[in-house]
Amino acid sequence: MSRKYFGTDGIRGRANGLITPELAMKVGQAAGLVFQRGEYRHRVVIGKDTRLSGYMIEYALVAGFTSVGMDVLLLGPMPTPAVAMLTKSMRADLGVMISASHNLFEDNGIKMFGPRGFKLSDAVEKQIEQLLDENLDKKLAQSTGLGRARRIDGVHDRYIEFAKRTLPRELSLDGLRVVVDCANGAAYRVVPEALWELGADVVPISVEPDGFNINKECGSTAPEALCRKVREMRADIGIALDGDADRVIIVDERGHVVDGDQLLAVIAESWKEDGRLTKPGIVATVMSNLGLERFLEGQELSLVRTPVGDRYVLEQMLKQGYNLGGEQSGHIILSDYATTGDGFVSALQVLAVVQKLGRPVSEVCHKFEPLPQILKNYRYRSGKPLDRAEVKSAITAGEKRLNGHGRLLVRSSGTEPVIRVMGEGDDRILVEDVVDTIVSALGGPAAA
């Protein structure tokens, strides 16, 4: 469908640009109207990350929801997967997370979960979008039917206990020194505490949010500081989350990064051995490395590919009955435990494998040699660059050059005005030349 407000992961944009108090209040009203069914009191849970604009958006959403008669339960800073879990646990009609995930503080967003903790379907988002463009004044609640709002205490402990229960009761992290980078984001309290309770020697970094430093030179999209800290502290493992903790990457004891593809391989192999895979395969996106696919073939496991976006991964998992899926970026979905990507719970599954095998992370987590993969971004101001004839011609020529030797993927980002050009294959020089040719046709140079 054509989307005016919703992208691949909710509504996202510059705070006080696209994401204004007026829009947030309207989203609260529209979503509240869509999710009010029956005569009982309806309620929504709202969590957020640590961006400065979170306060503004939170209060605007509260105004919107209460104005249509919904009660609001405010969770404060909490990981996105915790909000999804608590939506279901607290029997809410709707869950809302205020976050722009891995983006810097200037951006913010609104993503929503239904009563079972799953992200909203395209059809429901379309209903909300239609209401956003209507005058809703006549649909507001009467003065006696307005909603109430209150803050909920103790929610951090609920998530910590949930995360711990995903591990066997007898498993301890005793003897492991773990450096955890919380990206100055939503997980800054809960994840270090949970690791400590599991027995790890915890070294937390990027756990001092100030409203401006979320994802700034830290977290899963900027792991350099974590790599240095792991080497400095002679730690066994590093864990890097993003601002809302729905994605994770690992750093081994040598300071080398382990991406989402490798983590999927680790968990898939372990779960196959333990008989925990519901089907002989996993789900990943078109961005996952061909090396992962070849590794899985060696394990007699299949790889189902989807468009980019964890919502599409989950959609196929539910449709085809898989219980493991994810993205190269570190969104890992473990449907036995969660309804969305959970960076911390995914990290715990990897830690469980490390403890079970008693071997260094560098031996456990590098399962395959990734094929050379080149990804370049082209940022544009307006128009539809992919519709231009010279761009289409360059893409067609590139596909012919890589035919049988690799893959080419050119797509528009679902969250920002960027064209992503990805090529991979056995010949790095060939792949890079193909990608550079397409970026030049787009109008290069590539954005950082």
Curated annotation (Swiss-Prot):
One of its GO terms (biological process) is carbohydrate metabolic process. Mg(2+) binds at residues 101, 242, 244, 246. It catalyses: alpha-D-glucosamine 1-phosphate = D-glucosamine 6-phosphate. Its cofactor is Mg(2+). One of its GO terms (cellular component) is cytosol. The active site is at residue 101. It is an enzyme of class 5 (isomerase). The modification Phosphoserine is found at residue 101. One of its GO terms (molecular function) is phosphoglucosamine mutase activity. Activated by phosphorylation. It comes from the Bacteria. Binds 1 Mg(2+) ion per subunit. The keyword Calcium does not apply. HAMAP family: GlmM_B. Catalyzes the conversion of glucosamine-6-phosphate to glucosamine-1-phosphate. This is Phosphoglucosamine mutase. It comes from Nitrobacter hamburgensis (strain DSM 10229 / NCIMB 13809 / X14). The gene is glmM.
